[in-house]
Amino acid sequence: LAPLILLGLERLVKEGRCGLYCVALAISIYTNYYISIMVCIFVVLYFVVLLITEKRSFRIVGNFVLYSILAGGMASVLLVPEVCAILQTNFGDPDFPTQLKSYFSVLDELARHCMCVTTERGLEHWPNLYCGVAVFLLLPVYALNQAIPMKKRFANLALAGFMLLSFSTNVLD
């Protein structure tokens, strides 16, 4: 559902149409609330990128907040009991890290994109990344593509860099 959510978000920002975004996000939250937490975090980050690159009025921020809350409200029949149940467990009181700590180096993280890397099943915080080496070969092509506006290239590459950084630091994890 993530591609539909992002398509809906782009329609919301560019055309003011909210239906696909709201319904797809609600279905995502309802069907798998745990992964939807990550999807919602990415949606907020991508929304910021769209605000930077699309030259829209900040009135769209109100629509984004409204339809995001509406999507969460549509899934609240599942969310409210789940939140109550989680608050009764040890996960209800998370300890937020007080010091910045890196789990592994950037080169080690980038090596996870190569073939024949074992799947991480432990608690060593290694991300399972499977996009392949082609992404790194095509990254300079994207960065140097003059057909894409510089602001859009910079914002998208900054988002990708932030996501890679978030895999390896405890505060962003």
Sequence positions of predicted segments:
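Membrane-interface micro-motifs in multi-pass membrane enzymes
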Residues: 1-6, 13, 30-39, 125-134
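Hydrophobic, membrane-inserted alpha-helices
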Residues: 2-4, 20-28, 134-141
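Transmembrane-embedded, aromatic-rich helix segments that form part
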Residues: 21-22, 35-50, 82, 134-137
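Membrane-interface transmembrane helices that cradle and orient dolichyl/undecaprenyl
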Residues: 5-20, 53
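Membrane-interface alpha helices of multi-pass inner-membrane proteins
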Residues: 8, 19-33, 70-73
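Hydrophobic alpha-helical transmembrane segments
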Residues: 18-23, 36-40, 61-69, 152-160
